[in-house]
Amino acid sequence: MYTEQYNQLNRQRVDWQTEEEVRLGWLTILQNTLAITFHAERGRSDADYNQVIIEFKNVGLFHGNQNSAKFQEALEELSRYIPAKAGIEGLDVRHYQGIAIDGESIAFVHISSENGQPIPGPIMPLSPDSVQMVFEACRQSCRRAVTATNLIEDFGHGSVAGGNLMQA
């Protein structure tokens, strides 16, 4: 379903040398394909969209190993960002999904609502299936928390709806 996006990411990753290039490559394709806007580096998370939080690392630093230092760092960061965002938005952490991406591999992470510990899924290589899983997680995250910030973004004077209302 997202074969073209996988092909674009696979072509681009050959040239990626920094975490920033991984982040820009992924976010550009996600936003253009799904017509959504990620919040980049808010609250120190690399990117978030509704209840999906993505943590990027430099190319290949997971080494396909859940015990690698950079994968453990990504887990630790997601285990801070997800509860923080859940607290701000007033939702349970189980509604949030973390995704760790190092340009060559992808892992999904949930936070246990019992003990707050990260529960990682397997580290998957970049493939049409793993890319589709990321796109579907983002596409299906359509529930926005009712917060002042979200209401201003959706209906304030800088939004499409707000602009249309002011011109009516």
Go through the PLM ranges and name each one:
Residues M1-Q97, S105-M166:
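A short, conserved, highly charged catalytic patch centered on acidic carboxylates
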